[in-house]
Curated annotation (Swiss-Prot):
Main function: Catalyzes a mechanistically unusual reaction, the ATP-dependent insertion of CO2 between the N7 and N8 nitrogen atoms of 7,8-diaminopelargonic acid (DAPA, also called 7,8-diammoniononanoate) to form a ureido ring.
Native source species: Bacillus thuringiensis subsp. konkukian (strain 97-27)
Classification via CDD domains: DTBS
Name of the coding gene: bioD
Residues engaged in binding Mg(2+): T16, D51, E112
UniProt-recorded name of the protein: ATP-dependent dethiobiotin synthetase BioD
GO BP terms, alphabetized: biotin biosynthetic process
Keyword set, alphabetical order: ATP-binding, Biotin biosynthesis, Cytoplasm, Ligase, Magnesium, Metal-binding, Nucleotide-binding
Amino acid sequence: MSGFFITATDTEVGKTVVAGALAGVFRELGYNIGVYKALQSGHVASNPEGDAARLKVLSGVPTKEDEICPYSIEEPLAPRLAMKRAGRAVTLKDIIHHYNERLKEFNSLFVEGAGGLAVPYTEDALVIDFAKELQLPLIVVARPTLGTVNHTVLTIAYAKANGLTVAGVILSGCKECEMERVQENKVMIEELSGVPVLGLLPFFEGEFTKEEVLESAKEYIMISKLEEFIRNESTVAHTSSN
């Protein structure tokens, strides 16, 4: 298996934009990459305002929204609670099954979690349990300003304590007027966690196009570093199968 698990330090930090943009960029580079978000609350999968629809648009995958996200519900709560309140039972086994179905279509998947790693996800698992099953390297999406050092370092420590590899951090929503503080936070995160900050993605104000997002990702994220992970994972997978 290859790809990335995109998590964050909080909700509404920019995971979907980052996941969709990275998948779109790698697809432009010729990689057969898909996107997967097992559970979505706040919108049903077909809603154009929801994460599944935005992942589809940004990545450019042919996959239907309800295959990108097989379990979705409108109530904006932690997925486990939202599903429970709706009388729906979703297990870790269920979402791994759908993950494996997507792998029949793509060589690699960029998987988006929900909120942070300790979010109650399925009825029997947290987000981190799902990440541990997949064993994909993590990309941590974080806010760029006040409080982000603490949140990001804690997230990385929690991931490492659970045996996960963290490929890097992307600070999302960076404004030009705050860049001095953003750069200081970048340096502190790297020093305290030992994990590189691979990008400072700008703040997108108002409506934005797929092209604008992908061009920003190419300009502000170290795509070549992430490409090394994809290549290394593919090499390991090929070697293991021989």
